[in-house]
Design a protein with these regions (language model features):
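Basic nucleic-acid-binding alpha-helical/helix-turn surface characteristic of O6-alkylguanine DNA
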Residues: 1-85, 91-193
Length: 193
């Protein structure tokens, strides 16, 4: 949360984040979250997004997918993972994985077997990053400072050990640039996971 915001707004956002951390499996609606904060829907969405940096829906998606990834890594079925993650079924789980991870839950569960991931180093505002990209968008992003770049790349290869990995630094830079433009509000969402 931005350090220079009014206390009532900061308190409302902090309370919402705490609520989401404890009730994400209920998949609360934006309307429910705004009502809990005592704000109008539009004010809540705008204030939350401005001060947190992402929308309440995106925070909920991140919390949900973190749990779903853990369940899949533990060997749970797609149906059990979806239901245990507060989703209505495997279709919602599929959509969430494609939107956030740029791959299906099945591809994630198998560490990318039958998946081609193009990866490489690209330059960002925060320094070099190691970027992994599937045909659906970005699936991996790790800061790759000189002292940790080998470790970041080793972790990438372990995570996606069963995928076909193709190193192409020149191919990933425009994808990162496009993503950064989108995140700054200057681009479209095509090609982004």
């Amino acid at each position: 949360i931005h350090p220079n915001i009014d206390t009532p707004i900061a308190d409302g956002i902090a309370n919402t984040l705490d609520y989401l951390a404890h009730h994400w499996q209920d998949q609360p609606s934006l309307e429910h979250l705004a009502a809990r904060a005592g704000w109008s829907l539009s004010h809540f969405q705008r204030a939350f997004t401005e001060h947190v940096g992402v929308s309440p829906k995106r925070v909920l998606q991140f919390l949900t997918i973190a749990h779903a990834r853990d369940r899949l890594q533990d060997g749970a079925s797609l149906l059990d993972t979806a239901l245990d993650s507060g989703l209505s079924g495997p279709g919602r789980l599929h959509n969430l994985f494609v939107a956030i991870e740029a791959m299906t839950p099945g591809e994630y569960k198998t560490h990318g077997a039958a998946l081609t991931i193009t990866y490489g180093c690209a330059q960002s505002l925060f320094g070099p990053v190691l970027l992994g990209v599937t045909p659906r968008g970005i699936c991996w992003l790790a800061f790759a400072k000189p002292d940790v770049s080998e470790a970041a790349e080793a972790e990438f290869h372990i995570e996606w050990a069963l995928s076909q990995r193709i190193r192409d630094d020149r191919a990933v830079q425009p994808i990162l640039d496009h993503a950064l433009d989108h995140w700054r509000g200057h681009g479209t969402t095509s090609g982004l996971g």
